[in-house]
């Protein structure tokens, strides 16, 4: 791995992808591939990759994603058109965990990208490498590849990108675009919210009571339409309200007929009162509903929590089932391969045994046929059988005498056949002669020479002893 740190340039930029298989930490080479990195960072800032799937998985090769349509043919760059490839001499497809742009040909880069799962020298100078996966998140890439693959290298249950997060932006001048589609969607949602909606009381826990209250209000509004309304009109059964009006109305029809201006003013006042009473009715309805909701708000919270927990359980259960299915598939595949290997080994062993047995059986049958033929020829019994035996003995004697009289031929050992070798007939047993002379046991051979080393301590002692003896002889003289 040390050659990777030496050859690859330093990174500048960091993006985090949150997928269903875990987080993936990507470091960018923004100096070596500026266009590809700018395109990738801006798309991440705009949330372009959110909820997109990894639509292509090739085991031990690549994992491809970044297409919002999920077909492998969609996606566009932030420049509005495909941008050129960016190759660098220090960036090669020599390991797993590299991030590169996917394209359909030269200079045809859009929004799709892929991760490498191993060495891919055939992709060099064809795809732009702009990042690498760092840390332990590289194991999450391997989890992305652990899916069942169907036709056209598409996974059966593909993983997807939940969201993206730019941890370090190397381009300070990037401004996320406002998508036209989102603007239209917002306008349509605004129009829908302004339109009058139908009330669905079945969604409420107290739907029947709310529906009855709504019917009562509608009936009262029909009866009191065009008249001024007060709390006396709506709440007739309330004992706290007096039935006597606070101000008595003066029935003066003459003044009303004479003064048209006053009538117009009174009409305006009535309309204002009607509007006020409509607003009062709405407030009262809201208060009733809010009071009923306040009675037991914990139920709705518990229901929401239970629904969230149920969804989490379903998702976790589905993931566990997928894992178990993959594990079971692997075990079945391994058991099948093991069974096939055992069958092959047993077949080869049987074939070898059969060949050995067949060869031995053939030799045995040949020998048996040979002796059977000899036995059939020698079917005579009695005197004829004795004469035949004597004839064989005479033939053997003549062979011996001939071998003794003829001088032995000197042949090489390799040329002589063991079965046809007749040298043993003329062989003479001879023993090695031992001399009766007595030899010195210390002498191994007559030609043996004694090696005398003056430095040997034994020889030194002998010299000293001989010197002493010579001195003693001289003194005696």
Curated annotation (Swiss-Prot):
Task: List where Acidic residues composition bias occurs.
Answer: 208-218, 259-279
UniProt KW keywords: Coiled coil, Nucleus, Phosphoprotein
Can you give the residue ranges of the PPIase cyclophilin-type domain?
11-166
Q: Where in the cell is it found?
A: Nucleus
Q: Where is the composition biased (Basic and acidic residues)?
A: 230-240, 247-258, 280-299, 311-353, 430-442
Q: Where is this region: Disordered?
A: 203-355, 401-477
Ranges in a coiled coil: 308-381
Q: Which GO terms describe its cellular component?
A: catalytic step 2 spliceosome; U2-type precatalytic spliceosome
Tell me if Manganese is a UniProt keyword of this record. no
**Its GO biological process terms?**
protein folding
Q: Which GO terms describe its molecular function?
A: peptidyl-prolyl cis-trans isomerase activity
Where's it mainly located?
Answer: nucleus
**Where on the tree of life does the source sit, at the highest rank?**
Eukaryota
Q: How does it assemble?
A: Part of the activated spliceosome B/catalytic step 1 spliceosome, one of the forms of the spliceosome which has a well-formed active site but still cannot catalyze the branching reaction and is composed at least of 52 proteins, the U2, U5 and U6 snRNAs and the pre-mRNA. Recruited during early steps of activated spliceosome B maturation, it is probably one of the first proteins released from this complex as he matures to the spliceosome C complex. Component of the minor spliceosome, which splices U12-type introns.
Q: Tell me its family.
A: Belongs to the cyclophilin-type PPIase family.
Role, per record = As part of the spliceosome, plays a role in pre-mRNA splicing. Probable inactive PPIase with no peptidyl-prolyl cis-trans isomerase activity.
Q: What is this protein called?
A: Spliceosome-associated protein CWC27 homolog
Print the organism lineage. Eukaryota, Metazoa, Chordata, Craniata, Vertebrata
């Amino acid at each position: 791995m040390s050659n990777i740190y030496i050859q690859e340039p330093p990174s500048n930029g960091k993006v985090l992808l949150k997928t269903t298989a875990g987080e993936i930490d990507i470091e960018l080479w923004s100096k070596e591939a500026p266009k590809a990195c700018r395109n990738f960072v801006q798309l991440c800032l705009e949330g372009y990759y959110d909820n997109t799937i990894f639509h292509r998985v090739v085991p031990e090769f690549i994992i491809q994603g970044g297409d919002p349509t999920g077909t492998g043919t969609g996606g566009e760059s932030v420049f509005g058109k495909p941008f050129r490839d960016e190759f660098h001499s220090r960036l090669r497809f020599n390991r797993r965990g590299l991030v590169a742009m996917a394209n359909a040909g030269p200079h045809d880069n859009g929004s799709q990208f892929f991760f490498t799962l191993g060495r891919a020298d055939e992709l060099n100078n064809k795809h732009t490498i702009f990042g690498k996966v760092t840390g332990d998140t590289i194991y999450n890439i391997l989890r992305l590849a652990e899916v069942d693959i169907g036709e056209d290298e598409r996974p059966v249950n593909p993983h997807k990108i939940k969201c993206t997060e730019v941890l370090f932006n190397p381009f300070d001048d990037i401004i996320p675009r406002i998508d036209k589609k989102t603007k239209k969607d917002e306008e349509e949602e605004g129009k829908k919210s302004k339109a009058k909606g139908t009330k669905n009381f079945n969604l409420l826990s107290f739907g029947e009571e709310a529906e009855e209250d709504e019917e009562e209000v509608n009936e009262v509004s029909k009866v009191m339409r065009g008249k001024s309304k007060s709390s006396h009109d709506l709440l007739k059964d309330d004992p706290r309200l007096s039935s006597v009006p606070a101000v008595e109305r003066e029935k003066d029809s003459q003044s009303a007929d004479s003064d048209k201006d006053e009538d117009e003013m009174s009409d305006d006042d009535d309309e204002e009162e009607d509007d006020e009473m409509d607003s009062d009715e709405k407030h009262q309805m809201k208060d009733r509903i809010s009071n009923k909701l306040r009675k037991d708000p914990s139920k709705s919270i518990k229901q929401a929590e239970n629904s969230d927990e149920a969804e989490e359980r379903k998702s976790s259960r589905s993931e566990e089932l997928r894992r178990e299915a993959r594990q079971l598939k692997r075990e079945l595949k391994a058991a099948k391969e093991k069974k096939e290997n055992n069958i092959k080994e047993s077949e080869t062993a049987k074939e070898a045994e059969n060949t050995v047995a067949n060869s031995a059986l053939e030799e045995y049958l040949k020998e048996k046929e040979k002796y059977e033929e000899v036995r059939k020829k020698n079917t005579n019994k009695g005197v004829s059988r004795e004469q035949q035996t004597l004839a064989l003995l005479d033939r053997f004697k003549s062979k011996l005498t001939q071998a003794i009289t003829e001088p032995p031929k000197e042949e090489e050992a390799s040329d002589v056949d063991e079965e046809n070798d007749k040298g043993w007939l003329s062989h003479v047993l001879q023993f090695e002669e031992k001399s009766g002379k007595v030899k010195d046991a210390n002498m191994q051979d007559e030609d043996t020479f004694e090696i005398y080393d003056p430095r040997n301590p034994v020889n030194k002692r002998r010299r000293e002893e001989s010197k002493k003896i010579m001195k003693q002889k001289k003194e005696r003289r």
